[in-house]
């Protein structure tokens, strides 16, 4: 009996993380951490395995800047793929209390792939995404604003 109760408590603790995090599916506007301007509009979707993927559905370049049309410097399978429609975030998984982990983030301008984690604001309108290599302290953060 004690063994069954212990298993139930353990299972509850393990699976509660994904229950507590809000659904982040929808349309998001990215805000560049260096310029403060929007770079793109993304569509975030939840995959059948419960992780999230985000693709670029609109490029919003700052005035006077002509964006690249293809992912020239990107590794396979992204090499020379159109940036519009490109999945730039994959594997983002709910952890707990509006925290998300285990993402892979592609920067289509440099072709670099980063590890990523995110935190959703209390009102569900802002997602702060942190991309990094190795240690989170050595990364960059970007804010995404919910559009719908």
Where in this protein do the model-derived segments appear?
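Central antiparallel beta-sheet cores of small beta-barrel/beta-sandwich binding domains
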Residues: 30-116
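Edge beta-strand at a domain terminus
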Residues: 126, 132-148
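Cleaved targeting-peptide boundary
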Residues: 21-28
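Cleavable N-terminal signal peptides
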Residues: 8-9, 19
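Sec/Tat signal peptide C-region and signal peptidase I cleavage site
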Residues: 15-21
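Bacterial N-terminal signal peptides that target proteins for export
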Residues: 1-8
């Amino acid at each position: 009996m004690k063994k069954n109760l212990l298993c139930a408590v353990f299972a509850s603790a393990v699976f509660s993380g994904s229950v507590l995090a809000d659904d982040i599916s929808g349309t998001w506007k990215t805000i560049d951490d260096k310029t403060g301007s929007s770079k793109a509009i993304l569509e975030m979707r939840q995959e059948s395995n419960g992780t999230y993927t985000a693709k670029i559905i609109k490029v919003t370049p700052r005035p006077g800047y002509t964006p690249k049309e293809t992912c020239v410097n990107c590794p396979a399978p992204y090499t020379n793929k159109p940036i519009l429609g490109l999945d730039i975030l994959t594997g983002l998984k709910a952890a707990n209390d509006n925290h998300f982990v285990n993402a892979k983030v592609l920067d289509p301008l440099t072709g670099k792939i980063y590890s990523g984690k995110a935190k959703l604001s209390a009102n569900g309108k802002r997602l702060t995404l942190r991309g990094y290599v190795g240690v989170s302290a050595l990364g960059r953060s970007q804010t995404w604003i919910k559009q719908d």
